[in-house]
Amino acid sequence: GTGKTHQAVLTNLPKNKQVFQTTLTADSSATELVGHYIPDGDGGFEWNDGIGMKAWRTGGRLVINEIDHAGIDVMSVLYAILDDPSVAKFTLPNQSKETVKPKKGFEVIATMNGVPQDLPEAIADRFSVKINIDTVHPEAIESLPENLQYAYSKNLAEDEIPMSIRAWKAFAKLSETLPVSEAAEIVFH
């Protein structure tokens, strides 16, 4: 709820840079990053790059949410994807065994709710900058309906642990079809 993904996707994004985004869980598969075969419509199969390889090929931005939730399968691929671009390469498990290298401009931003020490040292070391985001991005607050922006700011000032901006957006949406008291009961209790 503080807008980490919002900031990761939009902050300092060059005009034509593509963004590829995923949210990891313990059950996420490396195929999400590397790729896999899909039916081609003619009874055969064709290779489909995962978002990590797409970001490499285009010099795009790869946003990895909840990186600290990555399982062993994904973590093994992250070591390669996050390696120094001057030496990074990955041989795809496709028919041609193609070797892919990151195109100039490739960048990775990872988010997590934990602390950097929650990551394996070799992964944490691949991020030269670590930023603690403990306030909501102003644009995220501005995305709330005007009548809720003040209420959110008041909640932020009064509560030790404020409700996430996501909860306030859900409240705003429910308030369109339900009485405010019912929407508040559903979202905030």
Q: Residues of each region from the PLM?
A:
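C-terminal regulatory/interaction module of P-loop NTP-utilizing enzymes
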Residues: 1-189
